[in-house]
């Protein structure tokens, strides 16, 4: 058996032994959204430490547990703490949570993150709906022997981010009078922030925002046939655009400041997704 799949099955067995809940939407919380759990009607929680072989987040502001519950009447599983490739994990571990949430029953993966704005016109505190992505600078989560039980060897990636879900976000933003931009997200490895020339390269490639997560999770989800949705909170202007040195504290501060609007947008979007599924 594929070692990555064997590890995934052990994690699933740990989950089933402790939790009796089937989510429809999987939500990964980025920086600044960690307390979104307060907006969920919580049924149960499961610490990452209590799942055999599960990778544990080490980043400040990422608590490290699954939350199971309801947003309105929509059953969700929420990752309160994300695992990042730069923490030293293999890429198969980086996407293990995504794969596990699919096995739990989730049909939609809702990705959120804090990202650096690259293109002119981006401002700290903006929201960006991810329409496409660039993941060429980090290892593919599908590298190695294909896990046939999850998906095909050569999956199509021409439309990773579901168009219907994008429309739902835009309608929710309009109803809440929240301005949302659209663009392409690029994932770099981190943990260091980008240099000015790296940012210039990303801009030349057509990226609008840059971060250290999300794209590989989206690939893994698409490989399994999940519908994928992504929103970035532009927490800072990338290196070379602003003269202010970058820091994680700045990222967290901006994300925290816009968290109420971000949480409202996430809630309205999930409610609309639930209505569409019914």
Question: Where are the language model's segments positioned?
Answer:
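Active-site/ligand-binding-proximal alpha/beta "capping" segment
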Residues: 166, 171-208, 266, 273-277
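Short acidic/polar active-site loop segments enriched in Thr and Asp
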Residues: 107-108, 208, 227
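Histidine/lysine/aspartate-rich catalytic loop segments that bind and position anionic ligands
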Residues: 134, 138, 144-191
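His/Asp/Glu-rich mid-to-C-terminal helical/loop segments that flank catalytic regions of hydrolases
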Residues: 239-278
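Zn-dependent metallopeptidase/amidohydrolase metal-coordination segment
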Residues: 212-250
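Non-catalytic positions within long, well-ordered alpha-helices that form the structural scaffold/packing
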Residues: 101-105, 203, 222
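Polyanion-binding loop/helix "lid" in catalytic or ligand-binding cores
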Residues: 150-161, 187, 199, 255-267
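Metabolite-binding pocket within alpha/beta catalytic cores that recognizes anionic/polar moieties
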Residues: 1-157
